[in-house]
């Protein structure tokens, strides 16, 4: 496949960008109170639906003209053409000369997507079939550990996308998980993480999934070696490794040397970035937890949103609209962050998952031509589940000096039988979005009898923008839909900003430096340090604390 052709024009030089700059000056002080007063139908008109999700974007600081100009910007920047190039399997990851085919991971059986002359969908389903067969063996008890006991505990060992996605999905879908099994996740190279995950488990009932494409990732392989020693020491046999470890990797030689039968190695491809891989073999722990049928439902949800993004006009395209609104606040209002507020305790790790997805994708300072950008790119992503966050950081959103656009995610049907609590939870979603939009004026407070000296402190200015996303119920299908919503949201932003959303060279630099420093910390003899004076001093203090020579 040829590489996708992209316009070299800088986004800030487009007609739409210049029009948006002028438009911003015109409406920057317009209040949402006025926008709603002028248009009684705004709350139903500025909405969009697709793939089972309902997006209310009416509480954004936009007019019809704003949205028209944002869509014009997307078209001038070739968002639709770049989207289509991705779905065709073209190499839109230009720095690594790779296709970007996470959409192939959930393409229905029989679909054809050609990358480098090969139908990758057939390969995807071959791995899915392998995963399903293995998952069924573990779930049924057919797969037994070294001593003949069935597996009751599964520990996923990975880092970044090999960890955040599986952990987020397991917690989100725990109501669909096998209650007889325990699932845990180890990522941090801090030994406390491994100890916490294993302290109350029996090795003869525990299966480790080692997730590393190269089987060389420092954190993952350090934890893998620790896990191997734990199993071998507990079960007094090297042969136990083959029954208590499987791998998600492409390094058959490394997997075999570790002691894992390569028949129990689940592969994936270089056209899938780690942060886009939770629905690849990286999701093996998810499939074991919820079962192959529920995993298929999750993939169907991903595909539902893929098709919505691929076929829906930008004016009603959920991920495109959300991405363009992020551009609006990031580049015209100067907002530096986006808050992600899921009102579901099961979605507590969703903000952390989106941190990697968005910040690793769009945290870039050069454009596709290699030139330093003269415009802001990816915002900081953060958040907590509601209502927890209301009692910690919402105060700053309501009355602070920072503009923080927020996404509120609400589920209409509860998973818990405690429906009264769900009513309270949902009331808080709607109340927070309303309060942020409209605030409370001094006149309103005085009419309610607020003491004069207190009134200035109690005023909430409002005009804080939010999206509200309504989901029927937190099911495997809905989770897939929501993840794909944000994947394509990120894509839209990156295409507008003219950056490569699919590489991560900044991450690589830190890995290289860490490999250099490790032997300098470990050596018995005093190392010849050649870092800057700060790093040399820090290394020296560490060595001194551990009684090593300097």
Where on the chain are the PLM-derived regions?
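Flexible, glycine-rich loop/tail regions that form catalytic "lids" or insertion modules at the edges
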Residues: 2-37, 41-78, 320-332, 347, ...
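Extended, charge-enriched "interface" segments that sit outside catalytic cores
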Residues: 11-16, 23-24, 28-35, 41-147, ...
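Helicase-primase coupling helices
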Residues: 58, 376, 380-473
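Glycine-rich oxoanion-binding loops at beta->alpha junctions
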Residues: 122-144, 169-171, 175-204
């Amino acid at each position: 496949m040829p590489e996708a052709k992209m316009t070299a024009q800088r986004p800030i030089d487009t007609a739409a960008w210049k029009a948006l700059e002028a438009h911003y000056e015109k409406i920057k002080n317009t209040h949402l109170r006025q926008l709603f007063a002028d248009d009684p139908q705004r709350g139903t008109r500025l909405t969009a639906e697709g793939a089972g999700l309902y997006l209310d974007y009416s509480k954004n600081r936009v007019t019809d003209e704003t949205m028209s100009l944002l869509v014009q910007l997307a078209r001038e920047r070739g968002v639709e053409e770049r989207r289509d190039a991705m779905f065709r399997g073209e190499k839109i990851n230009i720095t690594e000369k790779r296709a970007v085919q996470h959409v192939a991971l959930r393409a229905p059986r029989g679909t054809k997507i050609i990358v480098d002359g090969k139908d990758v969908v057939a390969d995807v389903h071959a791995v899915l079939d392998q995963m399903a067969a293995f998952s069924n063996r573990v779930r049924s008890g057919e797969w037994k550990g070294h001593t003949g006991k069935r597996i009751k505990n599964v520990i996923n060992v990975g880092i970044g996308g090999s960890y955040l996605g599986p952990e987020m999905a397991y917690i989100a879908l725990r109501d669909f998980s096998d209650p007889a099994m325990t699932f845990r996740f180890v990522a941090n190279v801090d030994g406390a993480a491994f100890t916490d995950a294993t302290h109350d488990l029996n090795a003869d009932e525990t299966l480790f999934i080692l997730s590393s494409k190269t089987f060389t990732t420092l954190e993952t392989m350090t934890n893998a070696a620790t896990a191997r020693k734990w199993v071998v020491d507990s079960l007094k046999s090297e042969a136990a490794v083959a029954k208590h470890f499987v791998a998600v990797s492409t390094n058959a030689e490394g997997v075999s040397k570790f002691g894992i039968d390569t028949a129990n190695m689940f592969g994936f491809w270089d056209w899938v970035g780690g942060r886009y891989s939770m629905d690849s073999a990286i999701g093996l722990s998810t499939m074991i937890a919820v079962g192959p049928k529920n995993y298929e439902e999750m993939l169907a949800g991903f595909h539902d949103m893929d098709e919505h993004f691929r076929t829906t006009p930008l004016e009603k395209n959920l991920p495109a609209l959300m991405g363009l609104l992020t551009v609006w606040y990031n580049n015209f209002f100067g907002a530096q962050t986006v808050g992600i507020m899921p009102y579901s305790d099961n979605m507590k790790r969703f903000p952390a998952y989106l941190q990697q997805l968005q910040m690793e994708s769009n945290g870039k300072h050069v454009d596709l031509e290699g030139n330093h950008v003269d415009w802001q790119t990816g915002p900081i992503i953060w958040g907590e589940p509601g209502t927890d966050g209301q009692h910690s950081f919402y105060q700053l959103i309501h009355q602070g000096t920072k503009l923080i656009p927020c996404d509120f995610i609400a589920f209409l049907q509860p998973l818990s039988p405690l429906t009264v609590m769900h009513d309270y939870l949902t009331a808080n979603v709607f109340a927070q979005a309303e309060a942020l939009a409209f605030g409370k004026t001094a006149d309103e407070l005085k009419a309610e009898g607020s003491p004069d000296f207190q009134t200035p402190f109690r005023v909430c200015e409002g005009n804080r923008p939010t999206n509200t996303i309504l989901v029927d119920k937190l099911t495997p299908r809905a989770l897939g839909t929501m993840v794909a919503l944000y994947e394509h949201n990120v894509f839209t932003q990156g295409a507008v900003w003219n950056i490569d959303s699919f590489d991560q060279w900044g991450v690589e630099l830190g890995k290289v430096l860490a490999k250099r420093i490790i032997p300098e910390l470990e050596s018995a003899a005093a190392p010849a340090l050649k870092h800057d004076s700060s790093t040399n001093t820090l290394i020296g203090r560490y060595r001194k604390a551990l009684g090593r020579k300097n």
